[in-house]
A protein has these predicted regions:
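Extracytoplasmic surface signature
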Residues: 1-168
Length: 168
């Protein structure tokens, strides 16, 4: 596993990585566990990701995943995807179209500003090179958000503390 994230209600643990099975069942690079029982949760079906998941962020009934994948559930998604809870399971939100030119390593969802902060090895975010290595897209549509940073090097980890964002 590359990344672990708890749901906002602390009842579910989301796990991303490069695995293809969990307990003998197909789970392509992303799975959820019920924290109380330790069992695989039916919340996340096998999404058929073609590359690893290295970042997960939760916001309300939505999950955002990032990594090295270019396909989710048979649809082209360049290293970023949004999953929305519907009918007791998370499903791919096909209308959310954010994309990064290279691997995404970390995500921070900021519901107050409506932005998803994205960090990684990419040189462009949603086609804009000024967002290299660290940028933001909107939680709602995945379009480039009005936020910019120019770290000049790859950002592998980000953390928010109050109104400040720290990057390493």
């Amino acid at each position: 596993a590359y990344f672990l994230a708890a749901s906002p209600d602390r009842k579910t643990l989301y796990v991303g990585g490069a695995f293809s099975t969990v307990n003998g069942a197909a789970h392509s690079r992303f799975v959820a566990f019920d924290i109380a029982s330790g069992q695989v949760s039916p919340l996340v079906p096998n999404l058929g990701l073609n590359g690893s998941v290295k970042a997960i962020a939760a916001s309300g009934d939505d999950l955002y995943i990032g990594g090295a994948f270019t396909s989710v559930a048979g649809e082209a998604h360049s290293r970023l995807a949004k999953l929305s809870l519907a009918g007791g399971q998370f499903a791919l939100d096909s209308s959310w179209r954010a994309g990064a030119s290279d691997e995404v390593r970390d995500l921070v969802a900021d519901p107050l500003s409506g932005r998803l902060i994205v960090a990684g090895w990419f040189k462009s975010l949603d086609g804009y090179t000024s967002s290299g290595h660290l940028g933001a897209v909107t939680l709602a549509s995945g379009g480039l958000a009005n936020w910019a940073s120019h770290p000049g090097y790859e950002v592998l980890d980000i953390a928010r503390c109050g109104t400040k964002l720290y990057a390493a």
